[in-house]
Amino acid sequence: MPFVMAIDQGTTSSRAILFRGDISIAASAQQEFPQHFPASGWVEHEPEDIWNSTLSTCRAAMEKAGARASDIAGIGITNQRETVVVWDRVSGQAIHRAIVWQDRRTADVCTRLKADGYEPMITDKTGLIVDPYFSGTKVAWLLDNVPGARGRAERGELMFGTIDCYLLWRLSGGTVHATDATNASRTLLFNIHTGEWDDELLKLLRVPRSMLPEVKDSSAHFGDSAYELFGGSIAIRGIAGDQQAATIGQACFTPGMIKSTYGTGCFALLNTGAKPVRSNNKLLTTIAYQLDGKRSYALEGSIFVAGSAVQWLRDGLGIIKHASETGPLADKSDSMQSVYLVPAFVGLGAPYWNPRVRGALFGMTRNTGPAELAHATLESVCYQTYDLWAAMRADWPDADAAPPVLRVDGGMTASDWTMQRLADLLDAPVDRPVIQETTALGAAYLAGLSAGVYPEPQKFADNWRLDRRFKPAMSAATRERKLAGWGRAVKGLLASDEGE
């Protein structure tokens, strides 16, 4: 039985997982790498750290499984989206550290684009809003701030890519410069309706077309790994951004299905099918996947801080040693206190989209302590998800056609406390799958589909298995009171920005 290898390149670590033909996991390896914060709101990675951690985890997973290159039918890549690398076409050397999706350095550029009236045109073409989150203004910043970069780019000497594209380039020995439609759709440079790079957007952001990769289906033969990397060539057969890969891994192939992934941030996607749906509630319209040249679209809500808020409790405040301690600590909180954390550590994402505000605690008293902070931190993830859920239900024209269910995945879903509170606040069932590695599974499925190892999407969906369903247990009065308190906290934070 052949293996399929998934590369899951994330914000804080790189992982490789070998899946069997029955989608069970044969072996995995993970390696963290450093984050760099050179200025307030700036987040960077060393491209070599990303590459070296990816390569070493692939080799480690293969060794654990006793797998040779000839035993692997294909590699699927999934990646932190929007993060950008620009490198020399000949040497392969990056001209600067990778600028990470969380980075806010281009906030002023985005403000000017909005003030000049460009946002409606950009949104019409890309489905995105103008925000530092996306790749386009990051590329422009690199070209304008790295000495000589713009001239080199205009002479065709530089290449641009999101992390999937950079890894593909490195894996292929510098022979393949390509990406897939899901990653391209996150750049502010790609027209999601035509499926092509858009000349008007490229001109606006002054990004030379020669820098851009070829855009392919999410399940396709992108190229082959260099022989010397794994002692034999392996076909690279699938690519998708991490949230789209999780949507696939959760088997959300039917329009109306919603998944939410909890990692560093939180990202919810609602499959809208073959037609893009324009949001009236500041959600993004994006490509969910592209198979056989046909695009499926999604509404997406992006939250910048979820699991990283728990890391803050551990690393910043030192009130826990392990993430697993957060739920039991939250259980000890004083029920008479109503403490709200709005974790806008790098601004607020959907549906508020304010890059300037910063995090705040509301409702603290003299008796507020570690338990209340843990409680507020976990609840903040649930409240933010509620905001996305409500916006999606309002935007989706067929929202009342089927009972709402949220499929969840990611590290935070191991917390029963958080998942139960999420179901309570949504007033809807929350389904946690047996296979938690849904992002990697989605990448593996795309590669396995191309290689003929895995079946067509609907047959794959039949193999999805439920671990636990969390059902709402909170009274309507309590739910409404808590949601109203959250609304006041967010309003107060946004008002602080308006007052500056």
From Swiss-Prot:
Pathway the protein contributes to: Polyol metabolism; glycerol degradation via glycerol kinase pathway; sn-glycerol 3-phosphate from glycerol: step 1/1
Residues where ATP binds: T11, T12, S13, T264, G307, Q311, G411
Catalytically driven reaction(s): glycerol + ATP = sn-glycerol 3-phosphate + ADP + H(+)
Residues the record lists as binding glycerol: R81, E82, Y133, D242, Q243
Control of this protein's activity: Inhibited by fructose 1,6-bisphosphate (FBP).
Cellular component, GO, one term: cytosol
Binding site for ADP: T11, R15, T264, G307, G411
Keyword annotations: ATP-binding, Glycerol metabolism, Kinase, Nucleotide-binding, Transferase
Stated name of the protein: Glycerol kinase
Organism per entry: Rhodopseudomonas palustris (strain BisB5)
Name of encoding gene: glpK
